[in-house]
C-alpha cells in the first residue's frame, strides 16, 4: 500500500522517502575490499548483469557464450578477492548497476569490490543497486562511455543512500524476493514460448531453403551436413560468388556530438535496429563507400561469442548510415540471388557461425572472413527463389506477430518488476501487513 508519511529527500533520483528513514552516504555503509586472491583455492568469477557475479564455467553453461579469457601472461596473484555477499562495480555498471556475488572467488583487477561495514540486509541493497533510478545516478559519474571513465568507489561513497531500519530492510527484501520470483517465473514461461516459436520458424526456413517446396522432386546428397539432401536441379555455390559486396564496415572516430550515425552489431543483436543505442562518428559518409549501409543489405555480426553470427535484413533505410568494423555488410545482385533469401539462409546458421566460423584470440573471437566467403550454400533457380521467399515471408510474418505480442508482455512484466522494486526500496509503498495481500 502507498506510504502516506513521506518527506522530501532533496535527492533527485530518490524523490520522497518515509519520514522515519535516514539518508547515509555509501562510504559509511560499505568498505572497499583490497585483498588479492589465493588462486590455488578460489575460482575465477565473472560479473554479469543478469546473473550477478558467477563462476566463468557457470556463465558459459547458462548463456552458451564464452567469457572473456585472461591473457596468458596475466599474474593471477594480482586478481581481486571477492566473497559471498560482496558487491562488484563492473565495467558495465553504468548500464546495469552493481553486481552481487553468491560465490567466493577472484575477479579481474579492473573491477572494484566492496562489502557492508554495518549490519544491513544485503538483499535490500542488492535490489537498490539494480534499480533504474540508481543506475541513472551512476551514469552521472561516467559522463560518457567514450570518455573511458569507469565508476569509482569514491564517487559511489559520496552518494546518499536510503537507509531504513534493519527490520524494515528485512521486510522489503523478503517481499521483493517473493514478488520478483513470481514475475521472473512468468517471464521464463513466456520466454520459453518465444523460443518454441523461433524454433518452429527456423524449422520452416531450414526445410524450405534446403529441400524446396515440392516433396516429389528428385533429390541428391549435398555433402554438407546442415543441408543434407537437396533437389537435383539445385547447386552449391560459395557465398562470395553470389554477392556483389561482402566487406566489414569502418573503424569510426566516435564523437559525443551528433555526426554520422554508426550502426554497430549491438544495435541489431536483438533482431531489430535499436536506434536508442546509436553512436556517432566524425567520419564523412560520402568518403566511406565501404561502410555505407543501403536498403536490402544484410548486416552480419562478426565479433564476440554472444553476438557473432547474428544477422539483420535492412528492408529500407535512409541514406547516411555507416556500419562499424564489427559489422559485415553483404549485398547481392537480386537478379541472380535474392538478398532476403540469403538473409533467411544466414538466419538459421547462428550456431554454425558462432562455432566453426570463429577464430579465437585470448580476449575475443571473430568471424573467419575467409571461411565465411568460401562457405557453400544451396542455390536454386530464380523461379524457385521467388516461390520459396513468398512462402517463408507468409509463414514468418504470422509467427513474428505472435512473437511480438509475447515480447510486449515480457516488456510489461519487466517494467512492472522495475516499478515495484523502485517503489519499495525507496519506501513509497509499504510492505503489506496481511499475508497474501496484493499490490
Model-identified regions with their sequence ranges:
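Non-catalytic DNA-recognition/assembly elements of restriction-modification systems
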Residues: 4-41, 45, 158, 166, ...
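A short glycine-rich beta-alpha junction/loop motif
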Residues: 6-9, 91-92, 105-112, 145-170, ...
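Sequence-specific dsDNA recognition surfaces
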Residues: 7-10, 27-42, 47-84, 237-252, ...
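Short, well-ordered beta-strand elements within core beta-sheets of diverse protein domains
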Residues: 12-16, 70-71, 112-117, 157-163, ...
Amino acid at each position: 500500500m502507498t506510504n502516506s508519511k513521506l518527506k522530501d529527500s532533496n535527492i533527485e533520483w530518490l524523490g520522497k522517502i518515509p519520514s522515519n528513514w535516514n539518508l547515509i552516504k555509501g562510504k559509511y555503509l560499505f568498505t572497499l575490499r583490497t585483498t588479492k586472491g589465493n588462486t590455488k583455492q578460489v575460482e575465477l568469477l565473472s560479473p554479469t548483469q543478469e546473473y550477478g557475479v558467477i563462476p566463468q564455467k557457470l556463465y558459459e553453461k547458462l548463456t552458451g557464450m564464452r567469457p572473456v579469457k585472461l591473457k596468458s601472461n596475466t599474474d593471477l596473484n594480482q586478481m581481486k578477492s571477492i566473497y559471498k555477499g560482496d558487491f562488484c562495480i563492473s565495467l558495465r555498471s553504468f548500464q546495469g548497476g552493481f553486481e552481487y556475488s553468491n560465490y567466493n572467488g577472484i575477479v579481474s583487477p579492473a573491477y572494484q569490490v566492496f562489502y557492508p561495514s554495518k549490519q544491513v540486509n544485503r538483499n535490500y541493497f542488492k535490489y537498490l543497486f539494480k534499480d533504474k533510478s540508481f543506475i541513472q545516478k551512476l551514469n552521472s559519474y561516467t559522463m560518457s562511455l567514450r570518455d573511458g571513465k569507469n565508476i569509482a568507489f569514491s564517487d559511489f561513497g559520496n552518494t546518499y543512500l536510503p537507509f531504513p531500519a534493519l527490520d524494515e530492510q528485512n521486510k522489503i527484501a523478503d517481499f521483493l524476493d517473493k514478488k520478483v520470483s513470481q514475475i521472473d517465473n512468468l517471464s521464463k514461461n513466456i520466454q520459453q514460448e518465444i523460443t518454441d516459436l523461433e524454433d518452429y520458424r527456423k524449422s520452416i526456413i531450414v526445410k524450405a531453403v534446403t529441400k524446396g517446396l515440392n516433396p516429389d522432386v528428385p533429390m541428391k546428397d549435398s555433402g554438407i551436413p546442415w543441408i543434407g539432401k537437396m533437389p537435383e536441379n539445385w547447386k552449391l555455390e560459395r557465398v562470395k560468388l553470389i554477392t556483389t559486396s561482402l566487406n566489414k564496415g569502418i573503424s569510426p572516430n566516435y564523437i559525443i556530438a551528433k555526426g554520422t550515425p554508426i550502426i554497430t552489431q549491438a544495435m541489431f543483436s536483438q533482431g531489430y535496429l535499436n536506434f536508442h543505442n546509436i553512436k556517432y562518428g566524425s567520419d564523412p559518409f560520402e568518403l566511406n563507400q565501404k561502410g555505407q549501409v543501403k536498403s536490402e543489405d544484410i548486416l552480419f555480426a562478426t565479433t564476440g561469442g554472444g553476438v557473432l553470427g547474428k544477422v539483420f535484413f535492412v528492408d529500407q533505410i535512409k541514406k547516411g548510415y555507416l556500419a562499424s568494423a564489427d559489422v559485415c555488410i553483404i549485398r547481392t545482385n537480386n537478379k541472380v540471388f535474392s538478398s532476403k533469401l540469403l538473409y533467411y539462409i544466414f538466419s538459421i546458421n547462428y550456431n554454425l557461425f558462432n562455432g566453426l566460423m570463429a577464430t579465437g584470440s585470448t580476449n575475443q573471437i571473430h568471424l573467419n572472413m575467409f571461411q565465411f566467403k568460401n562457405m557453400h550454400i544451396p542455390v536454386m533457380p530464380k523461379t524457385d527463389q521467388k516461390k520459396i521467399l513468398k512462402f517463408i515471408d507468409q509463414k514468418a510474418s504470422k509467427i513474428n506477430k505472435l512473437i511480438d505480442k509475447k515480447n510486449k508482455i515480457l516488456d510489461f512484466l519487466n517494467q512492472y518488476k522495475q516499478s515495484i522494486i523502485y517503489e519499495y526500496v525507496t519506501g513509497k509503498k509499504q510492505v503489506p501487513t496481511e499475508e497474501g495481500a496484493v499490490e
